[in-house]
Design a protein with these regions (language model features):
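GNAT-family acyltransferases
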Residues: 1-142, 159, 163-172, 187-231
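Conserved G/P- and acidic residue-centered "switch" motifs that form tight phosphate/ATP-binding loops
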Residues: 28, 147, 177
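Generic recognition of short, well-ordered alpha-helical segments
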Residues: 116-118, 134, 148-151, 182
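Conserved acetyl-CoA pyrophosphate-binding loop and the N-cap/start of the following alpha-helix
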Residues: 143, 147-156
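Conserved active-site alpha-helix within GNAT-family acetyltransferase domains
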Residues: 150, 176-192
Length: 231
């Protein structure tokens, strides 16, 4: 039997030095709609909800606010990525600190990263099999190509296995989305073939608790190498 979901600590939740998560709020509407206007994002989707329209994005976020309270421990969370301070500004501030012109608090303020909207990460029930959970991510293209998807995916899996006590978790992606499939393999998932997903066919991946425990003892570089070989 799956235990009741323990409450999450107060947001934002740190997934890594580069990534933090929080609940969506009304002020995220424009960022959410803007992300979905990008044809590179839309090309990867296996649903057709018109989130590029601000009114639809606003209703979606309002629904999430209710979802968070009705389904504690699961949800679609806003991802914020850290952008480092300008190098020249930082160097100037550090010199000023060394010269005694600014104090520690002001230097720390300059050194702090800027947190900017990066997309979302999700841990939700599978629509076609509500007893199961799936992880997902949707990121702005300027956040692609790094390790944010892995950082967020590992946070979601810790939540699913350690926080919620799940025995397995699923992942889905467009069959043509090789980048998403690779990310799922690096996280430890294994492909199971095609499966129905929101009225479409999607590539399905599965990860069990025992494999998760073994896989995530490996350094990430080893997981990357093994996932590439498995593909």
């Amino acid at each position: 039997m799956t235990a009741a979901a323990p409450p999450l600590p107060a947001p934002p939740w740190s997934a890594s030095a580069r990534l933090r998560l929080r609940e969506f709020a009304a002020h995220d509407t424009d960022d959410l709609a803007d992300m979905h206007r990008d044809p590179r994002v839309r090309a990867q989707l296996v649903d057709d909800l018109p989130l590029d329209e601000p009114a639809t994005a606003a209703r979606f976020i309002a629904g999430l606010r209710d979802f968070y309270r009705r389904h504690e421990g699961t949800g679609i969370w806003c991802a914020e990525r850290a952008l480092p301070p300008d190098a020249a500004t930082l160097a100037e501030a550090r010199q000023a600190h060394a010269d005694g012109e600014i104090n520690d608090a002001l230097l720390a303020l300059v050194e702090a990263p800027e947190w900017r909207f990066g997309g979302w990460f999700s841990l939700v029930h599978v629509i076609d099999d509500p007893a199961e959970l799936e992880i997902g991510a949707r990121l702005r293209p300027d956040a692609w190509g790094g390790t944010l998807a892995l950082d967020g995916g590992e946070w979601l899996l810790r939540r699913a296995f350690d926080g919620l006590g799940r025995e397995r978790v699923f992942g889905y992606c467009d069959p043509a989305n090789r980048s998403a499939a690779h990310c799922l393999r690096v996280l430890g998932f294994e492909g199971t073939g095609l499966a129905p997903y929101n009225g479409h066919q999607a590539a399905q991946f599965r990860l069990g608790r025992d494999r998760w425990a073994d896989w995530h003892r490996l350094p990430r570089r080893d997981r990357l190498r093994r996932a590439a070989a498995a593909a």
